[in-house]
């Protein structure tokens, strides 16, 4: 049976979490790594919401889905699939909660609550708390945009991360919390090939 981690529900419950060792056991809005996106979105929606200009290398296609009716906990659910995969198998999945500039502290509070639950659920995984760093985006010329980041590594190289992004007005992006699940293969590609 899948362990359903709907992160924001866990924050408000006193559930005892089972230790997990497979990223496919976790869901964001009922969606998991390894699922076909066609179970949740039409092909037309996937194509319409694809951001084909996001990566330099086109091996994977990112899809940004904002404010769908079935989203209960997140404002957006984003995913990546191999560009030529007609089944649209999800290899990276994110839940996003948006915040106004004046509400960034709410993002940090929510992040701490989620991390507390994840630390229990993933006590068997290697955990790395990066803390707060300057965002590397070319739009961040004044070095005012930051991100706060913690991630959990599975033994097979898959990863879950939690990040709060605090963007400056000059950057032009909206502050948000991001919970991301990704396979090792996708993570390696993202690190070494996506922007070449």
What does each model-identified segment do?
Residues 20-64, 92-196:
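Non-cytosolic coordination micro-motifs
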Residues 66-89:
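Compositionally biased P/S/T/G-rich terminal and signal peptide-adjacent segments
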